Amino acid sequence: MSPKQEEYEVERIVDEKLDRNGAVKLYRIRWLNYSSRSDTWEPPENLSGCSAVLAEWKRRKRRLKGSNSDSDSPHHASNPHPNSRQKHQHQTSKSVPRSQRFSRELNVKKENKKVFSSQTTKRQSRKQSTALTTNDTSIILDDSLHTNSKKLGKTRNEVKEESQKRELVSNSIKEATSPKTSSILTKPRNPSKLDSYTHLSFYEKRELFRKKLREIEGPEVTLVNEVDDEPCPSLDFQFISQYRLTQGVIPPDPNFQSGCNCSSLGGCDLNNPSRCECLDDLDEPTHFAYDAQGRVRADTGAVIYECNSFCSCSMECPNRVVQRGRTLPLEIFKTKEKGWGVRSLRFAPAGTFITCYLGEVITSAEAAKRDKNYDDDGITYLFDLDMFDDASEYTVDAQNYGDVSRFFNHSCSPNIAIYSAVRNHGFRTIYDLAFFAIKDIQPLEELTFDYAGAKDFSPVQSQKSQQNRISKLRRQCKCGSANCRGWLFG
């Protein structure tokens, strides 16, 4: 017998959105014992068992319409007939800056579309219905109705009469939603797990995401969308500056670490690689991974050995390129067919370090669980840390936490590749996944890598290349390159 699922009660409907024909397409639900930040937009079909809630909302609208027909009423519906809304926007745009008018117009366009947000669409496609409980439901009219009655010039008797009506409505609804008369609704859904940003406007969502970008370390990362009216990628995504170790992941043991004794002033001597103990894992270290400009050499294998905190050299050492971080300003932008992508705002010569692939470091067991869920969605952000052991202990998951690299798209003809950068030489289960340019990249050129692993980016064939976990689903490739394979993971 499965455990009983926790249910959540609807307190009231607080708003609605109409389609172009004036029909209701979404209701904004206030959940009992939850704040307005947990409000969710639900389609009418999800309220099939909440006739009392709908009836009260309709009564409230009629009452407000009768008491104040002026469109400036504080309780005027958020999405009136499209024509009237657009007219209102036109009237107010004269005193609003151009940038804000543009964001408002996009917001109006978005609200008038007969589709949900991306997250809502996914929930509907998977046929997950909202938990709307009618047992002992309390319908509480908005307190602002009482306050607003004073603004409308109502007498004390009228206010008292409204209070009595509210009590009568509440009692009648409790009776109507008793177990004897309530219908059985669809399976419950936890409001706290839903998109908590649906109440924000286009402008607010975009600015909130840009605020996240401003907090990223290093050169600026900007956001632009010249394709459609999606304000930004998911606001639930959190940017991090280093790996986020999860339960069961063992961090490197400092007792097993060692470093080199290279110069503390100029750092390692690029012309004398045999002196640096950090390269001892190479059979015959003939050169460092980097040249004098800090670019990865064309003859470098898939693994880069950098210095670490136990070395005598400083952070300015020429063998600490990845550790010094990103030097290129980047831009997250909306592509026409591939969702969000990333491009460089400056010219990047071949060999330039771009950034690292970050995320949660999870165990192989946890990765297996998540991999199944991600395959259901048709997408995965998992990278196995298996460069030194095919049976990898850990995997990097950038689904919810990560770097700008999380938005890198695939290409069958990529301009960047991923290297395994090791600096904890006695501990190879966790290492950096570092992106470098493998050809000259022009300003505003999209940064792409081969999701299946670039087999030929290095002339050194004795080492395998790092690749992300292969999805079980074949997906059509939209990279558009001349040598496109046609399918991802196929």
UniProtKB/Swiss-Prot annotation:
Family classification: Belongs to the class V-like SAM-binding methyltransferase superfamily. Histone-lysine methyltransferase family. Suvar3-9 subfamily.
Residues modified to N6,N6-dimethyllysine: K455
Binding site for Zn(2+) 3: C268, C307, C313, C317
Result of altering G486D: Abolishes methyltransferase activity
Function: Histone methyltransferase which contributes to the establishment of heterochromatin by specifically methylating histone H3 to form H3K9me. Part of the Clr4 methyltransferase complex (ClrC). ClrC preferentially ubiquitylates H3K14 and ClrC-mediated H3 ubiquitination promotes clr4 methyltransferase activity. Clr4 functions as a reader and writer of H3K9 methylation. It sets the H3K9me mark and afterwards this H3K9me mark is recognized by the chromodomains of clr4 and swi6/HP1, which then recruit additional clr4 leading to the methylation of neighboring nucleosomes.
Signal peptide residues on this chain, from the entry's feature table: none
CDD domains: CD_Clr4_like, SET_SUV39H_Clr4-like
Post-translational modification: Autocatalytic methylation of specific lysine residues in an internal loop (autoregulatory loop) promote a conformational switch that enhances the H3K9me activity of clr4.
Stretches assigned to the Post-SET domain: 473-489
SET domain sequence ranges: 328-452
Keyword flag Transcription: no
The name this protein goes by in its record: Histone-lysine N-methyltransferase, H3 lysine-9 specific
Region (Disordered): 61-133, 150-190
Biased composition (Basic and acidic residues): 102-114, 155-168
Ranges annotated as biased composition (Polar residues): 115-133, 169-185
Binding site residues for S-adenosyl-L-methionine: K338, G339, W340, Y381, R406, F407, F408, N409, H410, C477, K478
